[in-house]
Swiss-Prot record:
Residues 37-123 form the Inhibitor I9 domain. InterPro entries: PCSK9_ProteinaseK-like (IPR034193), Peptidase_S8/S53_dom (IPR000209), Peptidase_S8/S53_dom_sf (IPR036852), Peptidase_S8_Asp-AS (IPR023827), Peptidase_S8_His-AS (IPR022398), Peptidase_S8_Ser-AS (IPR023828), Peptidase_S8_subtilisin-like (IPR050131), Peptidase_S8_subtilisin-rel (IPR015500). Residues 1-17 form the signal peptide. Secreted subtilisin-like serine protease with keratinolytic activity that contributes to pathogenicity. It comes from Arthroderma gypseum (strain ATCC MYA-4604 / CBS 118893) (Microsporum gypseum). It is found in: Secreted. Residues 132-422 form the Peptidase S8 domain. The active site is at residues 170, 202, 358. Belongs to the peptidase S8 family. The gene is SUB2. This is Subtilisin-like protease 2. Residues 18-123 form a propeptide. Its EC number is 3.4.21.-. GO terms for molecular function: serine-type endopeptidase activity.
């Protein structure tokens, strides 16, 4: 293997103070609930025949209640079972039901839980003037990185994510962007009547941090577009469909040890999706998630609260926590998340500089892809242990009660000749 050094010229017209993206909600209020739509989780251990019989029962109850109470006249969605999700040992379905049917479902002996569907939000970002300090930070062992007109080396192994797939559950990816060099793949589009493109920009931006030739941590990795958002929000009906597709695609393609999922999304605590991420972990699949941008404890957010996801908070170039970044004991690691330049919407060469934990999470997802390309990491537990073992401790100012560990790619410990004075 060879070792590579990428010189990054950091140009910024001015230094802004702490950025403050609009916060995502911590709890599901009335505006977050999707009226008449539910996510039903079944108990583990049911046979295929039991699940089939249960769904027949659901359909009969739903039809009877529609006939008895004319639920469809209320304008609430009551179309019955909509989509089915199977992630490892977890069986779920979404559906449009009247309240009486939902109550009957909750009492069924095969049902673990019935939750109203909710809106979920992209971990929001703030646009600022262009900068590229984040990559240099990845190989600097947490050494503060100058922001103004300064050359910073990003040092990395030339395997650089080769032969690894990063799945981006987001707004889609412009796979034709020059940064992806043909490594972008259109995977799944859950949004009905919308093309599999990225008109919002967020997914392309995230993918560029993972695997862009200029802006990416893992410059040779493949990025797979899994579109569950069309704008800044979506629902678990689409998100679970997309996450289910990702897990099946990774499993069917026999690439569990060569794949990572990035979720730069955030919403109120939602146990059904935390359960989905946990079951993907049990199935052998690594998921990296944003801590969220509320400036509060990430334990109240999903998917940040998923116990076996890698939860990522944002750090600034001088090792301070931006005021927007969530924190707490659930945060595993800190990564660059302010003034990060990457790909953008609008053209195949467009770029944008943004801030938020949406930028921090793909730095770590990129690191996972990078390490998978040349290390034997046989399980998500091994991946997490390796990523955390490489971190540099006790550098983040105002980390509150979070584990104080900043991201590092381990290059200085590898047997290479480093540049003088690095």
């Amino acid at each position: 293997m060879q070792f590579l050094s990428l010189n990054l010229l950091l140009l910024l017209p001015f230094v802004a103070g702490d950025l403050a993206p609009q916060p995502e909600p911590l709890r599901a209020g009335p505006s977050d609930v999707v009226p008449g739509q539910y996510i039903v989780t079944l108990k583990e251990g049911l046979s295929s025949a039991q699940i089939r019989d249960h769904k027949k029962w659901v359909n009969s109850v739903h039809r009877a209640n529609l006939d008895s109470f004319a639920a469809g006249a209320s304008g609430v969605e009551t179309e019955g079972i909509m989509k089915h999700f199977h992630i490892h040992n977890l069986n779920m379905y979404s559906g449009g039901f009247d309240e009486k049917t939902a109550e009957e479902l909750s009492r069924n002996p095969y049902v673990k839980s019935v939750h109203p569907d909710q809106h979920v939000y992209l971990a929001k970002t703030v646009t600022q003037p262009q900068a590229r300090w984040g990559l240099g930070y990845m190989s600097s062992k947490g050494k503060p990185v100058p922001l103004h007109s300064t050359l910073v080396d990003y040092l990395y192994d030339d395997k650089a994510g080769e032969g690894v797939w990063a799945y981006v559950l987001d707004t889609g990816i412009n796979v034709n962007h020059v940064e992806f060099e043909g490594r972008g793949i259109l995977g799944h589009n859950a949004i009905p009547n919308k093309p599999h493109t990225d008109e919002f920009g967020h997914g392309t931006y995230v993918a560029g941090i993972i695997a862009g030739k200029t802006y990416g941590v893992a410059k040779k990795a493949n990025v797979v577009s899994a579109k569950a958002f069309d704008t800044g929000s979506s629902t678990y009906n689409y998100i679970l469909e997309t996450y289910d597709w990702i897990v099946r695609n990774i499993t069917d393609s026999n690439r569990k040890n060569k794949a990572v999922i990035n979720l730069s999304i955030s919403g109120a605590k939602y146990q059904p999706f935390d359960d989905a991420v946990e079951n993907a972990f049990k199935a052998g699949i690594t998921t990296v998630v944003a801590a969220g941008n509320d400036g509060k404890d990430a334990k109240n957010n999903t998917p940040a609260s998923s116990p076996n996801a890698i939860t990522v908070g944002a750090v600034r170039w001088e090792n301070t926590r931006p005021s927007f970044s969530n924190y707490g004991k659930i945060v595993d690691i800190w990564a660059p998340g302010e003034l990060i330049k990457s790909c953008w919407k609008g053209s195949n060469t467009a770029t944008s500089t943004q801030s938020g934990t949406s930028a921090a999470s793909p730095h770590v997802a990129g690191l996972v892809a990078y390490l998978m390309s040349f290390e034997n990491l046989p399980s998500p537990s091994a991946v997490t242990a390796r990523v955390l073992n490489l971190t540099i401790p006790n550098l983040v100012k105002d980390a509150k009660d979070s584990p104080n560990r900043v991201v590092y790619n381990g290059i200085q410990e590898r047997k290479f000749t480093l540049p003088k004075d690095y």
